Amino acid sequence: AFKMATGTGKTVVMAMVIVWSYLHRRLVPGSTLADNFLIVAPNVIVFERLERDFANNKVFYDLPLIPPELAGQWGMKLILRGDSAIPDPSGNLFVVNIQQIYESREEEWTAVNAIDAILGRPPKQDLASYQPSMLERIKSLGNLMVLNDEAHHVHDDDLAWNQTLLAIHENLQQKQGHGLTAWLDFSATPKTQTGTYYPWIIVDYPLAQAIEDQIVKAPLIVHRVGKEDPKRVVTDNVVQVYNEWIVVALE
């Protein structure tokens, strides 16, 4: 897990890991790293932020992260939430919010008689028009690395997020003899549901260090002198009531 304070560049680190793994797979004989990647956001708001960064492979070229002499090796196909594109053999980057994988799960199938039990699930009725779900496309990949954004939402055996990723891992084990290539968690607070930090943290970049390194701004502590707390605060007047506090914070 990567424990990084908010605003210190988790997205940049994700992009660096992806470039390193992808090019290693392409250039190093016998590499066991990934050339397929799944970035998972906890909700649509976080997904939209990731979408802005990764759309059209923007983040990889803006920083820049891809060495010019290796640009010809880069062939990553980007598949965003809602895309129906089929994965490419040259490598893929899926960026989704976890709810989309929930919604696209294959329906459970149970044999209704002995013949069904022997023959298994019947094929799709119209293969020509059939569109594989996001989950089906992800399960079809090999050499898959998962990167969880805001990963404090993930690790609880009862959480659907955790169960979904474990199901993908187990599916890969059954099909290819090995599961996920890597599972990386990114969060400012990578804690379990009981409040303890993940024992697999390998990077710890706290807010105090980020402030000292001038990566983020130092917090401003405002001391009130002779100022009473606002009263009768409602939704319609909250901006007006707290106007002085807002102005001070912005300045």
What are these regions (language model features)?
Residues 1-251:
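RecA-like P-loop NTPase motor core of helicase/translocase proteins
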